[in-house]
Amino acid sequence: MYSYRYLRPVSRSGRAILIQRQAYLRNITFTHFRCEENKSSASKRPTGNALNTKLNELNGSLNNLWNKFLEGRGVFQHHAKNIRKSIQEANKKIAEQEKESKDAKINYKKDELTNEEIKDLPSERELHRKKWSRKLEFYLDSLQETLFTATKALNDVTGYSSIQKLKNSINLINEKLDATRKARTDLKLQYTKAIESRTLSQKQLNELLQRKSSWSPSDLENFTKLYKDDAINQQTEKELKEKVRDIEKKEEQLTDDLYRAILTRYHEEQIWSDKIRRTSTWGTFILMGFNLVLFIIFQLLLEPWKRRRLTGSFEGKVRHALELHSQEQETKIRDFLEEIKTKESNNIANEQKTITKLSFWDKLRNTFQNSTGLSLTQFNMLELTVTAINSFLVGILFTLLLHAL
């Protein structure tokens, strides 16, 4: 069993839950056996076996789930470690770049023609760039490996990595099958040549045997050689026949393996696609539910708050505009009143100046008018009467003066 002594708290809690469930099932089994003690042994033994079988099956399924959980956690930890490693490598490259800029051995910038400093070198351009820009560039360089790692982790979780291994196995089987077919063709060709060679040697032997009575020493030597060659050809033919039989069996086995591997691949891909389809369906439902919750939150909470905020801001703007308008009107009215007061004060000053310019008789007339309390019309009539009497008296005096002269 897997040692869970040094697991994380989450893993230890999961293992504890599994152990509690197993203990619960054992308690159920023990209670069941205690209740069945009063029954017959014939009816008690099959029930105990069935419960033990179910208990073992459940225990095995729980252990399989636990092992899958540990395997998936290990895969995620491995890929997370690779991602952290790529980020650390990017930071290391930045540190090396800054260190190289301070190295005196690679810091020669003198132009021998003009005795001036060479500017705008690539290292200077890199240093003038912002640090986050350089980090982003290195992170983007390691992004490909990170994406590959993330894709591999996703394939490991969904089980597509095993399908990929099955595809690779199919390709290898196909290559082996092609090589086996080629080897079978070569062996069959060699087997055919061996048969032809043996047939030819047997024909020559038969010809020599037909004239056995007239053999010469060379014929005897030739017969011995042909007999040895025939034995060798027979052995070679037998070996090639066995090789052809073996390679044909191997070809049949590879063909059967290829057929079964292709069927298994399509079957597993169908299961994987159904799983992904179900997952995408549930993911779609979850997204729809999330969007629905967001819509309800926006409509019931955020929209009224936004409406109140807009209304309050609009009322504030209207109130501010009205205050500005009232201030402008008050300013205009105040200016108008000040202008009227200025005009009245000017009129009063003009009247006072006019009053100061009046003659003595006008002052006397005004004093008499104010003392007698006569109205303006009555005073004008009295003034006309006095003027007429005055004119009449002046005329009489002028006449008397003329008579006296």
Swiss-Prot record:
Residues 403-405 are mitochondrial matrix. Residues 76-118, 161-194, 230-261, 321-347 form a coiled coil. GO terms for cellular component: mitochondrial inner membrane. It is found in: Mitochondrion inner membrane. It is a multi-pass membrane protein. Keywords: Coiled coil, Membrane, Mitochondrion, Mitochondrion inner membrane, Transit peptide, Transmembrane, Transmembrane helix. InterPro entries: MDM33_fungi. Residues 303-381 are mitochondrial intermembrane. The chain crosses the membrane at residues 282-302, 382-402. Homooligomer. This is Sensitive to high expression protein 9 homolog, mitochondrial. It comes from Candida glabrata (strain ATCC 2001 / BCRC 20586 / JCM 3761 / NBRC 0622 / NRRL Y-65 / CBS 138) (Yeast). The lineage of its organism: Eukaryota, Fungi, Dikarya, Ascomycota, Saccharomycotina. The gene is SHE9.
